[in-house]
Amino acid sequence: MTSHPVFIDLSLDEQVQELRKYFKKLGAEISSEKSNKGVEDDLHKIIGVCDVCFKDGEPSQIDGILNSIVSIMITIPLDRGENIVLAYCEKMTKAPNLPLGKVCLQSLWRLFNNLDTASPLRYHVYYHLVQVAKQCEQVLEVFTGVDQLKSQFANCPPSSEQMQKLYRLLHDVTKDTNLELSSKVMIELLGTYTADNACVAREDAMKCIVTALADPNTFLLDPLLALKPVRFLEGDLIHDLLSIFVSEKLPAYVQFYEDHREFVNSQGLNHEQNMKKMRLLTFMQLAESSPEMTFETLTKELQINEDEVEPFVIEVLKTKLVRARLDQANHKVHITSTMHRTFGAPQWEQLRDLLQAWKENLSTVREGLTSVSSAQLDLARSQKLIH
């Protein structure tokens, strides 16, 4: 979302006077006379009635009025501006319809970008900004990812408690439209907890697991097990379910669902979607150890009919987690490469062996090139002597 700088030609006193007159004309309970207590008191009273303009008026006109209020707010010293900014942000969440909601969103974005990047007030503005963006279905205009979020607050990082509150909000506003982004947010949230307070993050940890399991684009779930709040769930059904998605095959999930059907459904998880993901994860695990698989093997392991194998493999290839070739004539699948579901000590050892083999091969090639180069040089010298 773009935002233009705030420039108002009138002086502060003139702006305050005009705003008071405007809102009084709209029927607001406010004096048209400027306060003798200073501009902060004027702003408090103006902001207190500013939502009266939501009842009538064109969005463009209201945008101009709010722009004027913002232009005054950003002149208030930091130590006296917090209550004013919070009051304004709260008013902006009260827009009665979508067009005015977008006006309020633009106004908050303008305020956010015109505050000093080192101002702690930017956090409060951004929090309300996300709330309004949700109302307007414009969340991705103000939040595109965790890295972008952190860069916004690089000069004044919020406290851990503030970030936890913000991450929870971001999870809530993205969970219905972008599960992948929502899952990343929850992982960041759990990462803010330490060993000392991870035990109080039970609800957040459960939400994180459920979001990751429900996301059709999240397949590598092993990192969740390392998060401290998730460790505190060991022994709980949700942790058992996560462990199945991390390292078990389809039959383990089927058995879990038969034993705990009500629990799975109570978490808002879709059984058919779970089956689809577990089939893919099972295929990945089979591909790690079997460079060649028959259709018959896949029908048994994945619990599908033989005529479903080809469409299934094609869907797997679309994820780019596995590279393979279908051999329809011989009813086989030839695996070229696959992502690992988990990456522990065995995978590190395999990677070490692979790199060592590459190193040895490169050394052999280098020695061969050196020999060829020396032979060519000797040949050139001998030909020169002959002539």
Curated annotation (Swiss-Prot):
Q: What PROSITE patterns does the record point to?
A: PCI
Q: Name one Pfam family in it.
A: eIF3m_C_helix
- A molecular function GO annotation: cysteine-type endopeptidase activator activity
Q: What is its main location?
A: cytoplasm
Q: Known SUPFAM superfamilies for this protein?
A: Winged helix' DNA-binding domain
Places the protein is found: Cytoplasm; Golgi apparatus
Q: Which residues form the PCI domain?
A: 181-340
Give GO terms for biological process.
formation of cytoplasmic translation initiation complex; Golgi organization; protein secretion; sperm individualization
Q: Which UniProt keywords apply?
A: Cytoplasm, Golgi apparatus, Initiation factor, Protein biosynthesis
Looking up InterPro entries in the UniProt record yields: COPS7/eIF3m, eIF3m, eIF3m_C_helix, PCI_dom, WH_DNA-bd_sf
Task: Supply the HAMAP family for this chain.
Answer: eIF3m
Q: What is the documented function of this protein?
A: Component of the eukaryotic translation initiation factor 3 (eIF-3) complex, which is involved in protein synthesis of a specialized repertoire of mRNAs and, together with other initiation factors, stimulates binding of mRNA and methionyl-tRNAi to the 40S ribosome. The eIF-3 complex specifically targets and initiates translation of a subset of mRNAs involved in cell proliferation.
For this chain, the family text in UniProt reads:
Belongs to the eIF-3 subunit M family.
Name of the protein in question: Eukaryotic translation initiation factor 3 subunit M
- Name the source organism: Drosophila erecta (Fruit fly)
Question: What does the record give as the organism's lineage?
Answer: Eukaryota, Metazoa, Ecdysozoa, Arthropoda, Hexapoda
